[in-house]
Regions:
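Alpha-helical packing segments of well-folded alpha/beta enzyme cores
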Residues: 89-96, 100, 132, 173, ...
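Proline-centered turn/helix-capping motifs that create local helix->coil transitions or kinks
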Residues: 144-146, 192-201
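A preference for well-ordered globular domain cores
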Residues: 101-103, 117
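Tandem repeat scaffolds
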Residues: 1-67
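Short, helix-capping/interhelical loops that line the mouth of catalytic, cofactor-
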Residues: 63-89, 137-185, 244-251
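Short, contiguous alpha-helical
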Residues: 109-163, 186, 203-251
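Amphipathic, non-membrane alpha-helical segments in soluble helical-bundle scaffolds
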Residues: 83-94, 119-126, 174-181, 220-223
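Charge-dense, helix-prone N-terminal extensions
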Residues: 95, 105-107
Length: 251
């Protein structure tokens, strides 16, 4: 088998002509302006952003978007551009997450600390969403330079920053994490409830040490990032809960 070399620092990949790749898990890889000629894909799972991807002359992006929206009608509402749109999207997310949390409670508590296929556990997912809300709403929108809770969890590839918690070894209970989450959800809900059309056209700046450090960043984009994180991570959580439920039944 030909070895595949991935250089994540420059986000490039060197794959020799005629390479044969089997049983390989490729993560966090970006392909831009790439042509695959004579490609054979069999029993392949692709999860990620698909844009301007043509297969055998067909742009598959719109087809995938339409099918995902058909399967999940709420998905089309996760690209808000108006005050009412953000309010609707956040209400949907809180409703959906309530059902996911109820489902998680039916599992043994120790399984909520168990990742599936190297992904975050359910508890870690909630901790990361707490981090995202603190970063983009607490810090960027509300201007609190240090909005963190000790259980907040940045993404795995984050460089790390002084003063920002990053404890991958913590094992808090579901109720403990949800206690933080309720406060963060309320914070976002209150910001969105008070949102005005004028604010959606404004920019925000935070240059104090930490992350994010941005100047004149669109306020609407801060809110959209949180909406996007909440939507996608719930799908991942539901997928992994399915796997954990199956494992529990088999045992």
């Amino acid at each position: 088998m030909t070895r595949v070399v991935v250089m994540t620092a420059s986000i490039t990949a060197s794959i020799p002509r005629g390479a044969h790749v089997e049983h390989t898990d490729l993560r966090a890889i970006s392909f831009h302006h790439v042509r695959f000629l004579g490609l054979e894909l069999v029993d392949v799972e692709i999860t990620g952003a698909i844009e301007d991807v043509t297969i055998n002359g067909v742009d598959i992006g719109p087809l995938i978007e339409a099918e995902l929206n058909r399967r999940m009608p709420d998905r089309a509402r996760m690209h808000p551009t108006t005050v009412e749109g953000f309010q609707e999207a956040w209400a949907i997310l809180e409703r959906l997450w309530a059902g996911t949390e109820d489902r998680a409670r039916t599992l043994p508590p120790e399984l909520l600390h168990e990742g599936v296929r190297g992904e975050w556990s359910f508890i870690e997912t909630l901790r990361h969403l707490d981090f995202a809300s603190a970063a983009w709403v607490g810090r960027m929108v509300l201007g609190d330079p240090v909005p963190w809770h000790p259980l907040d969890l940045p993404w795995d590839e984050a460089p790390g920053w002084e003063g920002i918690p990053w404890d991958r070894e913590a094992r808090p209970s579901l109720d403990e994490v949800l206690g933080v989450r309720r406060k963060r959800q309320a914070m976002v809900r209150e910001v969105i409830a008070a949102l005005t059309p004028e604010q959606l056209d404004e920019t925000v700046t935070c240059t104090e040490p930490g992350w994010p450090q941005l100047e004149d960043f669109p306020l609407a984009q801060c809110l959209f990032i949180v909406v996007n994180e909440e939507w996608h991570h719930r799908l991942y959580a539901e997928r992994d809960l399915d796997a954990l439920v199956t494992t529990t039944k088999e045992n």
